[in-house]
């Protein structure tokens, strides 16, 4: 994937995740690798972690998702 495309896609995914989760993922980082998207960040709910992953899966169904979002106590 070309760099400008990856950057644009990262921004689109970030906006989608923020909208779907109500901005409940802190320090969100998205890394796009060949055939896999890596998510990193922090949230207080397993549900929010899964919502973030679902956003990526819907947008990029052929990509795997490595969900490194950490669930922490609030």
Give the positions of each predicted feature.
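N-terminal targeting leaders
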Residues: 1-74
């Amino acid at each position: 994937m070309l760099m400008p495309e990856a950057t644009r896609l990262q921004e689109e995914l970030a906006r989608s995740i923020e909208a779907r989760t109500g901005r409940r993922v802190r320090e969100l980082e998205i890394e796009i690798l060949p055939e896999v998207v890596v998510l990193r960040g922090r949230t207080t709910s397993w549900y929010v972690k899964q919502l973030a992953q679902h956003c990526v899966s819907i947008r990029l169904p052929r990509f795997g998702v490595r969900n490194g979002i950490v669930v922490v106590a609030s």
